[in-house]
Amino acid sequence: MSKAGASLATCYGPVSADVMAKAENIRLLILDVDGVLSDGLIYMGNNGEELKAFNVRDGYGIRCALTSDIEVAIITGRKAKLVEDRCATLGITHLYQGQSNKLIAFSDLLEKLAIAPENVAYVGDDLIDWPVMEKVGLSVAVADAHPLLIPRADYVTRIAGGRGAVREVCDLLLLAQGKLDEAKGQSI
């Protein structure tokens, strides 16, 4: 890359050379759900059914990452059938729901995939995510993350959770690895 403190212009704005260097080595992207893949709102129906909105652009970014040899996993504190369904649609096979201590699932993923922590990126939005974020090679907070999480992250997205933040991270990883052009024309 370039000198420390330098940055690279991207379609999302300038990104530090340090972040790009970290992104270049990522082989596993771990995502939270509420506040990252969704906007954090939960809609409750009269019969107790739970609904969330997922951004199609995030889905496209995930598919591009998966087809570019970047594994994608979900670790979430809540449990919902609709998250299972969304993961199945996108081809995400590593799903950990109902995780009050996300470090347990993180350790399981590292062992199962034989990946070192420095080759992992984690995208979170709240304090439950911080224990994992401080262990990974690239920690990312979404733009509307908890105020205490933002200064601790290596990278803060320009886009809010549930609005394309995951796509921004996927594009960043693919750009750093020289694979972004391969994503053109793919279908989800």
Curated annotation (Swiss-Prot):
Q: Enumerate the residues binding substrate.
A: 34, 55-59, 63, 78, 86, 102
Q: Which UniProt keywords apply?
A: Hydrolase, Lipopolysaccharide biosynthesis, Magnesium, Metal-binding
Cofactor(s) named in the record: Mg(2+)
Task: Give the UniProt record's GO annotations in the biological process aspect.
Answer: lipopolysaccharide biosynthetic process
Q: What is its EC number?
A: 3.1.3.45
- Binding of Mg(2+) occurs at 32, 34, 125
One Pfam family it belongs to: Hydrolase_3
Q: Which pathway features in its UniProt record?
A: Carbohydrate biosynthesis; 3-deoxy-D-manno-octulosonate biosynthesis; 3-deoxy-D-manno-octulosonate from D-ribulose 5-phosphate: step 3/3; Bacterial outer membrane biogenesis; lipopolysaccharide biosynthesis
Q: Known catalysed reaction(s)?
A: 3-deoxy-alpha-D-manno-2-octulosonate-8-phosphate + H2O = 3-deoxy-alpha-D-manno-oct-2-ulosonate + phosphate
Presence of the UniProt keyword Hydrolase in the record: yes
The top EC class is: hydrolase
Write one Gene Ontology MF term.
3-deoxy-manno-octulosonate-8-phosphatase activity
Q: Which residues form the signal peptide?
A: none
Among CDD domains, the record links this protein to:
HAD_KDO-like
Family affiliation: Belongs to the KdsC family.
Briefly state the protein's biological role: Catalyzes the hydrolysis of 3-deoxy-D-manno-octulosonate 8-phosphate (KDO 8-P) to 3-deoxy-D-manno-octulosonate (KDO) and inorganic phosphate.
Q: How does it assemble?
A: Homotetramer.
- Put simply, this protein is called 3-deoxy-D-manno-octulosonate 8-phosphate phosphatase KdsC
